[in-house]
């Protein structure tokens, strides 16, 4: 043994341990002209609008990759990604401001396909102000 040496067990590391077994695999395509990168803890539902995928399936989920990692989508890239549900209190704040509260199905509202302001209502049951103005933060 050398001074400062760290000896670790040679076992597999299980990521997202304790998450619900409802893993979701979706196909994502970058329809924009710039690369887009999505981090491990980002609410995938709120990912860049240059990514085309079934956003409803991504609601309340993040990428099933190690913490700190990310997936990069080059222009025109199409890949399958695996998503897992958030654990804990299941409240999401920030990102694009589409949720800003609990992620439960009762709060979800839907608008016409392709509408840029699709998201969820706030805790008071009102549409988030950013959706009324069209500002996606």
Swiss-Prot record:
Localisation: Cytoplasm
EC number: 3.5.1.5
CDD domains: Urease_beta (cd00407)
InterPro entries attached to this UniProt entry: Urease_beta-like, Urease_betasu_sf, Urease_subunit
Keywords from the named record: Cytoplasm, Hydrolase
Family: Belongs to the urease beta subunit family.
PANTHER family (UniProt xref): UREASE (PTHR33569:SF1)
Protein name: Urease subunit beta
